Every structure is written in structure tokens, then in C-alpha cells.
Regions:
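Short beta-strand/loop motif that positions the catalytic acidic residue
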Residues: 251-253, 258-260, 264
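Catalytic active-site module of serine/aspartate enzymes centered on a nucleophile-bearing elbow/loop
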Residues: 300-320
Length: 320
């Protein structure tokens, strides 16, 4: 090979490497990076985009108003990698079971979980609404689809036991990415204070939900997912393939109730079906809500949703 062809080869390789790195960075910025954002102020309200949420606009705003008017206590913890993570505690009554609640992808606690406070109070539960890393009032700039958030969740569990006492009764609750987070947390060893897990419209794995969305956007996942995964490693400093809710269910021993709207076109209903089938715990239940889109199972069928949770607690033998 003469020098000309060698330079052409080296130039081509260099171009491909540079193009791959640029593509990986673009994927990271679009999919995982979370820039600082201004949250709604007094008299301002945010609801998720899309027609399915506009139908419930009045309810979503009313729930936000409700939790802004309720008394609450602010808490914060330090993550394993030095981020300050924040949450707000809404007490139903002293000694009530406490739900540790986690929101969805690119959401924040007030927007995604306000209705959950109403549901908690109907069940006689208190609620600790938590902003994920890189979301809401918490620090950070990288969303990790539950990979690092599960470690944060476990830290919140330890904090709650210290704060509320060894006799605290705790429930891990999440919606969408928050559901994936609590499910992955449940795959590890959890203390007896955790009584059960509620996973609303969670996905089976980061890879599966990301490739599903890529297909929806008419992007080739066989090409794009490896680039996105590279971006996560290089710029987000985590591995998208490290763990998944599906893997976690193989070792989960806590009771788990899965809830999912049948007409969810973002995280398919079938994902909760498969997660429930994979769950190895003695007590598990799938709450199916016809006609509910993504994250709307409770707004669509409030009484049925609450009653299903009451029945699940009875099936598990809980006296609260």
C-alpha cells in the first residue's frame, strides 16, 4: 500500500470516528441531557404535551393547586455521586404509611405526582414526592432511565427509615421512568420497612423503550441504539444496558402491583403484562385500565384504581 492510499484509509477512519462521536453526543444531548429549566411559579401550571392530557387539564391543574396549598416539609439527600436530591413530604396523619413517589422521564414531582397525593390520601397514606436527579428541584444534568436513579431511590429509602423511624411503613411508587426506577430498586435487597411496590406504566428495559421510540420516529434502532448507548457511556458516564426492570423482577421478593392503561401508545401495555409475568414475588397484581393513555390510569378510573390497591393490600395481609 502506497502512502496515498494509507492517508486515504487513515482519513476515512478518522472521519468515521469523528462522525460517530458527534452522533453519540447529539444522541446524548437529545435523549439524556437535561438543561436547567424554570419551573412554573405562583399562578402558573404545566401539563404534559398532547391531546390525551388536555382532556384532563382541569384535573391536573386542580391537583397542582391542591398540593401547593397543603402543608409540606422539604427534604434533601446527597446522592452517591454528590448531587443534592430534593423532595416534599405531605403527611396524611402521623404514623401513616408513606409512599416514596417517583415521576416520569423529563417530568418533575409537582407536575407528574400531584394527583398521586389525592390517591395516597384516599388510601390513608402520606406521600413523599421526589424529584429525580436532573429534574425539578434536584441537581444534575443527565437522565439515566432508572440506571442511576435506582441508587438514588435506595438512598431515599435509607433516609426515610432514619427520618420516620424503624417502624415506618414504606411503599415505593413510580410512574413511567419512575416505575422502572422502583422496579429496578426492588430487584435488590430491601429492608422490611418496604411493604410493597406500585409500578404505573413502567417499561421492561431502557433499551426496549428507547428502541421502541426510535421505531416510532422512523429511525433505525440497529444503527441508532448503539450510538445512543455510546453517548450514554462517553458523556453521561453510565451504561444503559447495566440493568433493567425485567432483570429485577427475576429476583424481586416484595409484593408488586402493576398498573397500566390499555391504550398507552408510549409505553405499551404489554410491557407491564410481561413484567408481571416475570415477577417472582409471592404477591403480584396487574391493574388494567381500559381507555387510559400513558400515565393516565388513575385520572381515567380513580375509584377503580384505589379499590384495586385496597384489595391488593388485603391480599398481601396488610392491616393499613
Amino acid at each position: 500500500m502506497n502512502d496515498t492510499w494509507l492517508w486515504i484509509l487513515l482519513g476515512s477512519v478518522g472521519f468515521l470516528v469523528a462522525a460517530t462521536l458527534i452522533a453519540a453526543y447529539v444522541c446524548y444531548r437529545l435523549m439524556l441531557y437535561s438543561a436547567p429549566r424554570r419551573l412554573p411559579g405562583e399562578g402558573e401550571y404545566e401539563i404534559p404535551e398532547g391531546e390525551i392530557y388536555a382532556v384532563f387539564r382541569d384535573d391536573l391543574i386542580a391537583w397542582t393547586k391542591m398540593i401547593r396549598e397543603l402543608p409540606y416539609k422539604e427534604y434533601s439527600i446527597r446522592s452517591f455521586d454528590g448531587l443534592t436530591l430534593r423532595g416534599k413530604f405531605y403527611e396524611y396523619e402521623p404514623g401513616a404509611p408513606i409512599e416514596l413517589m417517583f415521576h416520569g422521564y423529563r417530568g418533575y414531582a409537582e407536575r407528574d405526582l400531584s394527583g398521586g397525593v389525592e390517591r395516597c390520601f384516599k388510601l390513608g397514606h402520606s406521600a413523599l414526592l421526589i424529584d429525580h436527579r436532573a429534574s425539578g428541584l434536584s441537581d444534575g444534568n443527565t437522565i439515566t432511565f432508572g440506571i442511576l436513579e435506582r441508587r438514588d431511590c435506595r438512598d431515599w429509602v435509607d433516609f426515610a427509615i432514619r427520618e420516620f423511624g424503624e417502624d415506618a411503613r414504606l411503599i415505593l411508587t413510580g410512574i413511567s421512568m419512575g416505575a422502572a426506577t422502583v422496579l429496578m430498586t426492588a430487584g435488590g435487597e430491601l429492608p422490611p420497612q418496604i411493604k410493597y411496590v406500585l409500578a404505573d406504566c413502567g417499561y421492561t428495559s431502557p433499551k426496549e423503550i428507547i428502541t421502541k421510540v426510535m421505531v416510532d420516529l422512523k429511525l433505525p434502532p440497529a444503527l441508532m441504539y448503539p450510538i445512543a448507548s455510546l453517548g450514554a457511556r462517553l458523556f453521561g458516564h453510565f451504561n444503559l444496558n447495566e440493568y433493567s426492570p425485567m432483570e429485577a423482577m427475576k429476583t424481586c421478593t416484595k409484593p408488586v402491583v402493576f398498573a397500566h392503561g390499555v391504550t398507552d401508545d408510549f409505553v405499551p401495555y404489554d410491557m407491564s403484562v410481561r413484567l408481571c409475568e416475570a415477577c417472582k414475588g409471592r404477591y403480584k397484581k396487574l391493574v388494567t385500565i381500559p381507555g387510559a393513555g400513558h400515565g393516565l390510569a388513575f385520572p381515567v378510573a380513580r375509584e377503580d384504581y384505589v379499590e384495586a390497591l385496597r384489595q391488593f393490600k388485603l391480599e398481601c395481609g396488610f392491616d393499613f
